[in-house]
Amino acid sequence: MYAPNINSYKRYQAGSFAPTAVRWGADNRTCSLRVVGHGPSLRVENRVPGADVNPYLAIAAMAAGAVHGISHELSLEEMYAGNAYEDADAPHVPSTLRDALVLWEESELARAAFGDEVVAHYANNARVELAAFDAAVTDWELLRGFERL
């Protein structure tokens, strides 16, 4: 829901100001959730979704996560104060659509929030995208192949 295309994952690189670690912090751009503002303007910024998301689905996913956390009385981790790119203990955002597909299909939370049909639909969409990508010969592959001939 947050990174629907193959190219969505290219931005998840350390030092890119796109998050790689699933952490939250106060005005910390290395975290996936950034708390910013003061008083009535205090807000949480989810930095994982890119410009290529369906905003309605991204908001639905955030709401589903919030409801899940509240209904299961999950405790909030301590605020992260360092460089989250360097946090080896943090869970990480998937680095490819292929990795995200596995997590999506195995997610009980996604199935509970969206239903089996929606999970299957977006899983199929990812498979179609991956098959098209796997069949394409990129400029890099052509150049690399000619370098070695």
Model-identified regions with their sequence ranges:
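Acidic, glycine-enriched catalytic cores built around paired aspartates
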Residues: 84-149
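Active-site capping/gating regions of soluble enzymes
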Residues: 1-80, 84-87
